[in-house]
C-alpha cells in the first residue's frame, strides 16, 4: 500500500467534466478507522496511468475500500466530535460507475486488494486533466476531483 492510512469511498461518480470521489474512515477495523484523522486527512494517495495503445486510463486509490465494515460504538466514541452517524454501512458496487461524458467512456470501478481501481476509456476529446482535493462538511470528509479538458483548451484564472 501507499501509506498507513485507510479510507472508504463514500461517493464515486462520473460527472460532466471527469470523476469525483469523497471519502470516510474505513470501518473494517479500529486500527484502520483511527488512521483517518478528520481535518488532517486528505484524499488517499493515488496513481494515474494511461495505456496509450488502447486509450485506457487507470486511477488507483491506495488503501481505499468500496465496502465498509460495521461502524461500532467504540468507533463512534473515538470520533465523538465528528459526526459519521448515518454514513454506514456503505458499499460502492463493483462494475460500471456511471454515464459516459465528453472525455470518458466505459468507466468501471473494482476492489484490487486494499486499493480501489477505476478504469475508463478516454475519448478523442480528452487532452489533459487537473486534480483538485480538499475537505467537505466540517473538514471531516475529504474529496478528490479529476477534471478533464480538451487537447487544445487553456485554463485561464480570473481574479479580483
Where are these predicted regions, by residue range?
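Short linear recognition/processing motifs and adjacent strand/loop elements at protein termini
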Residues: 1-160
